[in-house]
């Protein structure tokens, strides 16, 4: 997922996606702790996706506040 795709989504969709990504990160941490995680690079990509979504949400909130 790239930033442009995220900017096209509504804030509600972004919040839903953020919750799903955080849940996935939680599950990946448990898999790593129990030794079941095979693709360790997925943790990094999920962590970066969480940051990307949070950044876009902040940008949208700032833009909404600036227009009011």
Curated annotation (Swiss-Prot):
GO CC annotations on file: cytosolic large ribosomal subunit
InterPro entries on file: Ribosomal_protein_uL29 (IPR050063), Ribosomal_uL29 (IPR001854), Ribosomal_uL29_CS (IPR018254), Ribosomal_uL29_sf (IPR036049)
UniProt keyword annotations, A-Z: Ribonucleoprotein, Ribosomal protein
CDD domains recorded: Ribosomal_L29_HIP
Keyword flag Ribonucleoprotein: yes
Keyword check for Cytoplasm: no
Pfam families reported in the protein's UniProt record: Ribosomal_L29 (PF00831)
A molecular function (GO) term: structural constituent of ribosome
Gene Ontology terms: biological process: translation
Family: Belongs to the universal ribosomal protein uL29 family.
Matches recorded under PANTHER family: 60S RIBOSOMAL PROTEIN L35/50S RIBOSOMAL PROTEIN L29, LARGE RIBOSOMAL SUBUNIT PROTEIN UL29C
Protein name: Large ribosomal subunit protein uL29
